[in-house]
Amino acid sequence: MGQIVTFFQEVPHIIEEVMNIVLITLSLLAILKGIYNVMTCGLIGLLTFLFLCGKSCSTIYKDNYRLMQLNLDMSGLNATMPLSCSKNNSHHYIQVFNTTGLELTLTNDSLIGHKWCNLSDAHKKDTYDHTLMSIISTFHLSIPNFNHYEAMACDFNGGKISIQYNLSHSSETDAMNHCGTVANGVLEVFRRMTWCTHCDTPLGASIAGFNCVRTSYKYLIIQNTTWEDHCTMSRPSPMGYLSLLSQRAREIYISRRLMGTFTWTLSDSEGNDLPGGYCLQRWMLIEAEMKCFGNTAVAKCNQQHDEEFCDMLRLFDFNKEAIHRLRVEAEKSISLINKAVNSLINDQLIMRNHLRDIMGIPYCNYSRFWYLNDTRSGRTSLPKCWMVSNGSYLNETHFSSDIEQEANNMITEMLRKEYERRQGTTPLGLVDLFVFSTSFYLISVFLHLIKIPTHRHLVGKPCPKPHRLNHMGVCSCGLYKQPGLPTKWKR
């Protein structure tokens, strides 16, 4: 009995302790909620902006996505395809392997005095480099409607290669008069290589589908040369030469069959083949470590071939597979890339960038790419080309809307994958049970609101329970025995 009395004496103290705990808990909740409200009301963001405006730039978009970039080093591709670059605005080069190449010079000084080109005699003597000659043939065959042989002169004595194209388009009138000739075609091909910065189309002049190109140079001279460090103005890239090949529709049927030889191989972080992403190794990048992209990003290249970065991945893959499987020589490698180009790269993308360059719109030079990195999960987007305008890369602010859209796409993709994951891990029976229980609850709420009556009352009389009256107001027990009294339903 004494223990019971003692317990009840301690009850007020226990209640006081409980009240203290409740007050502490409520205080903590109020403080945390207040801090959250202050953080999300925009005050701190406004103060941060006012403090950093004009001083600092952020590379974080949508709070979690960091803007990253990579620069591709395409010098390793010279094992299987020609690379082109520029020393200045007038001297341009095509590299074949590491030992030889071609020099293409826009000049006002003539190198060859005669006006003829005896190709048949050169073929009989067979003294020139066949690899270099195949590149020249590609360049020459890319000239639209070549039928003006007087505009071309050649010299193959002693195994050297010297070809001179005469240009006479220094004025707008000359450009219009010679529109569609071989000289104009040479300039058009040169522009397709994204080289001729001193070539322009006056007032958008065009006749019969040909752009009338104007230049201040009189000659284009092509010569073989030893390979040195010529690329001082631009980095070596295969895209100029491949842009010529992509215009040759007659190669398409041959090239489509070649893709069975090569597979879309993916590599893990150690370089081992693994179908779970693609890693750009150090030799593929400029001043950067290995960069890996997940299956989500790379899979888009297999689904739709409409990104410049996908073209570069295919070129790297082609280069690796050609060296590993075929061990091709120089001349054979040129022939191979000539046939495979339409299966590796999207010629519509190349033409679109070429037209952008002509019209002065920012275009892609296939060298620098940007992508978004999710700081929470480490996932990356598929890199997109960093556009070039007037010889320099655009500032980030010029394509901030594209960055925002890519961040939104990544958020949408994340939500979709999360939904699919949850759908795959949740048993179907459990989902059915949830739907049934929810429906049952809603029906029960409706039934509760309408208050269904349960028994009869005599009008003006108290509740007859436990007696159950029939429609005549009579109960069989005999207590309610007067029939005909008015009744009503009650709950």
From Swiss-Prot:
What is this protein called in UniProt?
Pre-glycoprotein polyprotein GP complex
Which family is this sequence assigned to?
Answer: Belongs to the arenaviridae GPC protein family.
Report the transmembrane regions from the record: 18-33, 433-453
Binding residues for Zn(2+) 2, per the UniProt record?
455, 457, 463
The UniProt keyword set, sorted, is: Disulfide bond, Fusion of virus membrane with host endosomal membrane, Fusion of virus membrane with host membrane, Glycoprotein, Host cell membrane, Host endoplasmic reticulum, Host Golgi apparatus, Host membrane, Host-virus interaction, Lipoprotein, Membrane, Metal-binding, Myristate, Transmembrane, Transmembrane helix, Viral attachment to host cell, Viral envelope protein, Viral penetration into host cytoplasm, Virion, Virus endocytosis by host, Virus entry into host cell, Zinc
Annotated GO biological processes are: fusion of virus membrane with host endosome membrane; receptor-mediated endocytosis of virus by host cell; virion attachment to host cell
Q: Native species of this protein?
A: Mobala mammarenavirus (isolate Rat/Central African Republic/Acar 3080/1983) (MOBV)
A GO molecular function assigned to this protein is:
metal ion binding
Q: Which residues are glycosylated?
A: 78, 88, 98, 108, 118, 166, 224, 365, 373, 390, 395
Q: What cystine linkages occur within this chain?
A: 85-231, 117-154, 179-212, 279-292, 301-310, 364-385
Q: Where is the lipid attached (N-myristoyl glycine)?
A: 2
Binding residues for Zn(2+) 1: 57, 467, 475, 477
Q: Which domain of life is it from?
A: Viruses
Q: Where is this site: Important for GP-C-mediated membrane fusion?
A: 33
Q: Record keywords: Repeat included?
A: no
User: What is the phylogenetic placement of the source species in the record?
Assistant: Viruses, Riboviria, Orthornavirae, Negarnaviricota, Polyploviricotina
> Which residues does this entry assign to the site Cleavage?
58-59, 259-260
Which regions of this chain are Extracellular-facing, per the record's topological domains?
2-17, 59-432
The gene from which this protein is expressed is GPC
Instruction: List residues in topological domain: Cytoplasmic.
Output: 34-58, 454-491
Cellular-component GO terms for this entry: host cell endoplasmic reticulum membrane; host cell Golgi membrane; host cell plasma membrane; membrane; viral envelope; virion membrane
